[in-house]
Amino acid sequence: MSWVRSVPLEQMRANALALARAAKALDMPLVLTSSLEDQMQGPLTEELAEIAPTEYEGRIQRSGMVNALDDPNFAAAVQATGRRNLIIAGVTNDVCTVYPTLTALQQGYRVQVVADAGGSMSRLADDVALRRMESAGTTLTSTNMILTELAVSWASPAGQALQPIVGALIPT
């Protein structure tokens, strides 16, 4: 995460963790992956282990594969969810998010990329990656947008479960 300069790091971290909390609250599949944890990319943030211990423990640790969907274990884990609609966020948007998004679109998935739950080394790199994904057919969204879309109504069970997660993101 420390590579990100396109968005405030703490905001991005809070957004990514909110997505994980929402997935757990709504009993949605959560597939985590990392690349070269013991090298320059480093491990996933430890807060994910607290929020989603089973998913963190079962994360797909890629051995340098840039496009996560080129990794057979990750591709199998995504397919095993049985879902055709994917919500994707990652660090960095211009590497770790763009390529699996493009591949997922080619494979017929509907993809929403949560732009503010990831970032890139520069604003320009982020903008280019987001434009490329959008022009290929992904829907760009924000953390607040996707959480409220999943809520549908604050009176619904999903809305009730997501209220504290969304509320924690409101600037004070």
Where do the PLM segments sit?
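Short, conserved glycine- and acidic-residue-centered signature motifs
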Residues: 8-12, 89, 93, 97, ...
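Short gly/pro/ser/thr-enriched loop/turn and capping motifs at secondary-structure boundaries
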Residues: 67, 94-95, 118-123, 147-148
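Internal catalytic-core helix/loop-beta-alpha segment
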Residues: 62-102, 106
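Active-site acidic carboxylates
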Residues: 1-64, 110, 127-135, 139, ...
